UniProtKB/Swiss-Prot annotation:
GO molecular function annotations of the record: DNA binding
Keyword flag Cell cycle: no
Residue ranges of domain Tyr recombinase in the record: 140-336
Database matches in CDD domains: INT_Cre_C
Protein name per UniProt: Integrase/recombinase xerD homolog
Keywords (A to Z) from UniProt: DNA integration, DNA recombination, DNA-binding, Viral genome integration, Virus entry into host cell
Hydrolase among keywords: no
A Pfam cross-reference name: Phage_integrase
Length: 341
């Protein structure tokens, strides 16, 4: 298994070096009027997670091209159409669309823009339209951890152990702050301000704040102590004696605390562990279940979209309205009115 991982990683690095131009943008590198410092800064215009996603997407396309004996850079429109039609046999429409975006962005970085960009060709757009019509674009997503789920989990944490205290703080804070898992593990002790009303968390960067303006998220004390994120967080920090650095960290089997940051994948594993202990199907849940659960629960409590967005930090109402529709799927059901007649 280790050898396989190393081979995959070495292949990934080779692909980036050979033809993933978003790391080393040709238009930037070949511009003699730009200073080296300016070039390096321009190369950071896209978020790291975006670049990683594009790199994986491009690697898949490049492998497909190599297998079929066709050129990936520059690719022909026909090559892209053939690729996405093969991809659509198993992948969702949204995945196919993201791959086309990655192919397009990489061609732009290599200097193929406008009408010279094969991913913008009318043939590719027509193929994508057909795939969307055939497969649809609805994303099911993971099940939400709702407010009532928090009560269900409350007695499952072993608070005699550091891991139990950490896991409780992580889950309840993740829900209360509607955090993405990457945001949750990046929170530093220095980002916290405790007040008589609760805690304010400063986020320097997030998916919705790519320019780094910074955002503040307020988490008030909950009247119900058993589901209070602020109390759980304070107990965890006090017991673990964390006074600087990442607030969520790995813990060894002998309950020894490490100084490094918890990985975002660990958030999903922790969530799955406790929903499984509660008798729920762990395969239906993931790290995003906390963020989705907050939005869905808020909708069920008739909280308006703008108020929900202040906590979730969504920049568009589209996704929030989708959560509201899902949260009220039974409340606004026509059958309920018929049954009550």
């Amino acid at each position: 298994m280790l050898l396989y991982i190393l081979l995959i990683e070495s292949r990934f690095i080779m692909k980036i070096k050979d033809n993933f131009m978003l790391i080393k943008n040709a238009r930037i590198e070949n511009n003699e009027r730009l200073s080296l410092k300016a070039k390096r800064r321009l190369e950071k215009s896209k978020a790291d997670n975006t670049l990683k996603a594009y790199a994986c997407d491009w690697s898949d396309f490049s492998d497909w091209c190599q297998y079929h004996g066709v050129t990936d850079l520059p690719a022909s429109p026909e090559t892209i159409v053939n690729y996405i039609n093969d991809l659509a046999d198993d992948a969702k429409a949204n995945t196919v669309s993201r791959r086309v975006t990655a192919i397009s962005e990489n061609h732009i970085a290599a200097g193929f823009s406008g009408r010279h960009n094969p991913a913008k060709d009318g043939m590719v757009r027509a193929a994508m339209s057909a795939i969307r019509r055939e497969k649809g674009t609805f994303q099911r997503g993971k099940s939400p951890i709702l407010m009532e789920t928090l009560y269900l989990l409350a007695d499952l944490f072993d608070e005699e152990k550091l891991s139990g205290l950490r896991d409780k703080a992580l889950i309840y804070l993740g829900f209360a702050g509607a955090f993405r898992r990457s945001e949750l593990v990046h929170i530093q002790y220095e980002d916290l301000t405790f007040t008589p009303q609760g805690v304010i968390i400063f986020m320097a960067h997030s998916k919705g704040d790519q320019l780094g303006h910074g955002e503040q998220i307020a988490i008030p004390y909950a009247p119900q102590a058993e589901i209070c994120a602020v109390r759980a967080l304070k107990k965890w920090l006090d017991t673990a004696q964390i006074h600087r650095g990442p607030i969520f960290r790995p813990i060894t089997r002998v309950q020894s605390l490490r100084n490094t940051q918890l990985s975002d994948k660990s958030v999903a594993l922790i969530v799955k562990k406790y929903v499984g202990l509660a008798g729920l199907d762990e395969h239906l849940f993931a790290g995003h279940s906390l963020r989705r659960g907050f939005a869905t629960s808020a909708a069920q409590h008739d909280i308006d979209a703008l108020t929900i967005m202040r906590q979730t930090r969504h920049k568009s109402e589209k996704m929030v309205h989708r959560y509201i529709e899902q949260g009220n799927i039974f409340k606004d059901n026509a059958l309920n009115r018929m049954y009550n007649k």
